[in-house]
Amino acid sequence: AHPDDAEIGAGGLMAKYAAAGLRVGVVDLTQAEMSSNGTPEIRQAESERASSVLGLAVRVNLGLPDRTFARERLVRAIRELRPRVVLAPHWDDRHPDHVACSRITEEAVFSAKLRRYLPDVEPFEVGRLYFYFINGWAHPDIAVDVTDVYEIKRRALRCYESQFTPPGTDGRYVATPLNTGYLDFVETRDRSVGRLISAEYAEGFAAKGPVRVERL
């Protein structure tokens, strides 16, 4: 939904896959203009720095008005970028935008393969859709060891200075859930998921329905 969401939930996975030579990208739906701290311009610059740290091949911001999302724009982005795997925020989250983003992404992934929907653009079927955690975490269906790239995730998150800098006496930043211990929460969560698979750090992902594999 917003710049920094993907880094919070899947920064390690993105860094790991980018380092392995896979083409990794992010589509931000909004510029987060309703955020308490920072401006759209600051958030854009921060996301560009984070993308560089992670080694992303592409980052697109659809520029949808914050708190409103458009399925058609996302379907067009999916058909243009043709991703094999799509990640979206988990459907159970305290932030309504994350819930809306989860729903519209699921709808767009489904609609992108329909030849009679937006027939001016060639349809495309996404291989897999998984959901990452932002403000909480249930028991994940999949856990990916990101220990070897965790420092890259930390660096990428620190690029979002406007969101994670604690409020001071100068009034530059106001207190929000993101700048009052949030990064500690993220790291604790990733350690906890890592413990489930005997790793120092791991990121968890959820799936709706069985995950198809050829062999165990």
Per-region residue spans from a language model:
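Active-site rim/loop-helix segments in enzyme catalytic domains that contact anionic ligands
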Residues: 1-81, 206
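Metal-dependent de-N-acetylase/amidase catalytic core
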Residues: 69-216
